[in-house]
UniProtKB/Swiss-Prot annotation:
GTP 2 binds at residues 210-217, 257-261, 322-325. CDD domains: EngA1, EngA2. Associates with the 50S ribosomal subunit. GO terms for molecular function: GTP binding. Keywords: GTP-binding, Nucleotide-binding, Repeat, Ribosome biogenesis. Residues 3-167, 204-379 form the EngA-type G domain. The gene is der. It comes from Allorhizobium ampelinum (strain ATCC BAA-846 / DSM 112012 / S4). GTP 1 binds at residues 9-16, 56-60, 119-122. This is GTPase Der. It comes from the Bacteria. PANTHER family: GTPASE DER. SUPFAM superfamilies: P-loop containing nucleoside triphosphate hydrolases.
């Protein structure tokens, strides 16, 4: 990307709506409630022929440094300092406030390029607010409607003028290089069923989920080594899913911080419902999901439901018992947590559970290695030959039950997909195979092929009867 743009302004002027318009997706939560956005949200923007990196920010307010609003303001000021250009958004419908004027003074003092944007200019009575914006001393405002997409060409022209043509349209040698495509030849006789090598160079998507105030944002900040995400004693600070990238041992990790998930009965406000829906999208987009527990009050009903949700979505799961520095008797608590994990999460037998402390950094290396190891299992493929030898063995040890006096027969097994591992078994009368025997097969696969902590799916298919066609011809 050629340059970075920060969208700034006071709360509820339409910054997130403009962000969504420029990235072409509804990435940021939008609501009439002021102050929905709290963390910096990055994205890749497309505006006519411009391509640039964009950052949505929290609404700027006058507040003390030790308050939540003050910490939000500090995050926004970091975004302004790191950006090449700021889009200063004002509400043309409502007009200017003393906060707008204070923000204009702050932007002028920083000495960086600013484009003044008069949003909601399609509204009746917005002319007064548009002309008032001239008094801010930041040049001619660009009238737009972020909601309806009006004024986008004028905004593009203003950005090019502010940043400069050379910066806006740099020559990119990568555009030529990307056209060179090398096709890998197919080797005759190659066995595509054998276990495939794990690609440890591919970027890994990890979602961090859990109850409110479990320490999710603190954990990510510790990984990054900076206060990138808002944290504090207040529950529910994070409202929408924020993605951040960092490097771990040469591998790109894309982490998604998410809003805390409360019990459904307690989720009343529309905004919180939007936040939970955003968290569900992050889970579905991720490959591995870390469920953060508060080790001082672990295994509440909501914790179990979150783990169950992650597994039902087919994601790889790792448990992180956070705030371990506050646990008084670590050895006894660890033994208790392991026992509860096995008893309360039978569907995730062998799931990796790591004691850690986001505040101090304790256990982070082990947690990250557990994430990588679990992702390897989630991507695991097993050859058909190995599976059928295994199927014969487990049936010898524990044959399928007889139903109505007739023994069930499992004839053939193959892996149909990975991510998560899914298997198809050809058998007689698949509808008659009891759930208990499917659990036996699932647990056997997990133990014999070393697949802890990931969902395993088994599909039963009726085997073809070679005499069926002969009966029909008669």
């Amino acid at each position: 990307m050629s340059f970075t743009v920060a969208i700034v302004g006071r709360p509820n002027v339409g910054k997130s709506t403009l962000f969504n318009r420029l990235v072409g997706k509804k990435l940021a939560l939008v609501d009439d409630t002021p102050g929905v956005t709290r963390d910096r949200r990055p994205g890749e923007a497309k505006l006519v022929d411009l391509r640039f990196h964009i950052v949505d920010t929290a609404g700027l307010e006058e507040a003390g440094a030790d308050t939540l609003e003050g910490r939000m303001r500090a995050q926004t000021e970091i975004a302004i300092d790191e950006a090449d250009l700021s889009l200063f958004v004002v509400d043309a419908k409502m007009g200017l406030t003393h906060v707008d004027k204070a923000l204009a003074d702050m932007l002028r003092k920083r000495g960086k390029p600013v484009v003044l944007v008069a949003n909601k200019s399609e509204a009746r009575g917005s002319d007064g607010g548009f002309y008032d914006a001239f008094t801010l001393g930041l040049g001619e405002p660009v009238p737009i409607s972020a909601e309806h997409g009006q004024g986008m060409i004028d905004l593009r022209d203003a950005i090019v003028e502010a940043i400069g043509v050379d910066r806006a349209f740099p020559e990119d040698d990568d555009d030529v290089a990307e056209t060179d495509i090398v096709l890998r030849p197919t080797v005759e006789g190659e066995d595509d069923e054998e276990d495939l090598a794990y690609d440890d160079t591919k970027p890994l998507r990890v979602a961090i989920v859990g109850r409110p105030n479990a320490g999710k944002s603190t954990l990510i900040n510790r990984f990054l080594g900076e206060d990138r995400l808002l944290t504090g004693p207040e529950a529910g600070i994070t409202r929408d899913s924020i993605s951040v990238e960092w490097d771990w041992r040469g591998r790109t990790i894309k982490m998604f911080d998410t809003a805390g998930m409360r019990r459904k009965a307690r989720v009343i406000e529309k905004l919180e419902k939007l936040s939970v829906a955003d968290t569900l999208r992050a889970i579905r987009f991720a490959e591995t999901v870390v469920i953060v527990f508060d080790a001082t009050i672990p295994f509440e009903k909501q914790d179990i439901q979150i783990v169950d949700l992650v597994l039902r979505e087919g994601r790889a799961a790792v448990l992180a018992f956070n705030k371990w520095d506050l646990v008084e008797d670590p050895q006894a608590v660890l033994a208790e947590l392991r026992e509860k994990t096995e008893r309360l999460l039978p569907q995730a037998r062998g799931i990796r559970a790591v004691p850690m402390a986001g505040q101090t950094g304790y256990g982070l290396e082990k947690l990250m290695q557990s994430i990588i190891d679990t992702d390897m299992v989630w991507n695991k493929r097993i050859s058909t030959a190995k599976l059928n030898r295994w199927l014969d063995s487990v049936q010898t040890q524990h044959p399928p039950p007889a139903v109505s006096g007739r023994r069930l027969k499992l004839k053939y097994m193959t892996q149909v997909k990975a991510r998560p591992p899914a298997f198809m078994i050809s058998c007689t009368r698949p509808d008659s195979v009891p759930e208990s025997y499917i659990r036996y097969l699932t647990n056997g696969l997990r133990a014999d092929f070393n697949m802890p902590g990931v969902p395993i799916r088994i599909h039963l298919k009726a085997s073809e009867n070679p005499f069926e066609n002969k009966r029909k011809r008669r």
